């Protein structure tokens, strides 16, 4: 009976944060400084003397050959007063992505701040938490494709969550803004200055100009999410139902022309939305299934960091749409673990005259045999296909790129059995078959990777996570 109760607690703790195998959130009870990390690093060859490379024709392809990505998670928090239920926490997460110095010899890296926020819990109202700052704001993922099909925001703002009904019901709201550095939201131009710059003299030939901001449009993104667990969180089996929505708004503006004498380009206000739902269930920890549906329109179809294109007649993207159906699942036993994931997406822009939209889908399954507690071997099989909506202009016909892949992955897992057991060190061999349309779609004729229907990838890699915050 004690083992069953312990398993229920473990499963419920896992389920509160997605039941998806994502890295768990920041520790909820630590006082003072705490630390966590997520990372993946790999190297590979195509067995033809070139760097190993991914061959994906869909928006979210296999994660096996993804480039290095690293995060360091720093936390500092404690109790409010003497009440252990009332807590505060500061989360700071720098992240790195790209080529490593040891591979390229270039001593410059691509860093970004992924999380920088503070939160308080149960202050004034039991079950209420408040946060503000810059944050990755995500739900459950499809691990095999490194894909968050329902809610995946990168926000600077704040939010609140309220858990009640013995934590079986959770309500969340978020409000944030961004101002992307692209022509659609921001512009600065040089204009004659009203006075000479301080760095020049009256006799200097340097022109007296200054930089002014002529376009500055902040996008507002508001989201709301409701989660209802089927049973109390300490009971198994269990399940949850999620409904989710977003609202996007971009105010009007005016863009200055590149050529002198041309009239400014008016940019009307624009809107977007996301509506979606998720159904999830689990028998025990890491034995689960999730089904997602997402419908997005206007700005919401591009995501919060997406740069709109394919405008309609009024320079709006209101007519753009995205529909996604996705699934993720995992099974664990003493000898075998099985991951599965897949999705279908249909995307269309707002330009009815020449739609750059597409339909795409991908499926993957990864069974893992546990030969010993620490030595495992996985086989991943996957298939992906993409169908652009319009005729390809160069080919003069509709194309349908397809890729089928098979990967063999020997694994050393120092923390034991489990498809989500991390860290793990692994070798990988992937054989990919590319249709003729996939070869045409992915590579220009001059590319050293072009003209191959069979692509090999032989490599080594490592992935880890511990005490990592993704919510």
Please report, for each region that a protein language model flagged, where it lies by residue.
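Beta-barrel outer-membrane channel/assembly domains of diderm bacteria
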Residues: 2-130, 163, 330, 367-369, ...
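Transmembrane beta-strands of outer-membrane beta-barrel proteins
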Residues: 31-41, 86-93, 128-132, 169-173, ...
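Extracellular structured ligand-interaction cores
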Residues: 32-34, 67-71, 87-91, 113-115, ...
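Outer-membrane beta-barrel pore domains and translocons
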Residues: 38-44, 93-97, 133-137, 163, ...
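Surface-exposed coil loops of outer-membrane beta-barrel proteins
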Residues: 42-62, 101-117, 125-267, 307-312, ...
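Solvent-exposed loop/turn segments connecting transmembrane beta-strands
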Residues: 64, 103-108, 150, 317-319, ...
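Outer-membrane beta-barrel transmembrane domain signature
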Residues: 82, 186-193, 197-223, 252-256, ...
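Detector for outer-membrane/organellar transmembrane beta-barrel domains
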Residues: 219-229, 233-412, 464
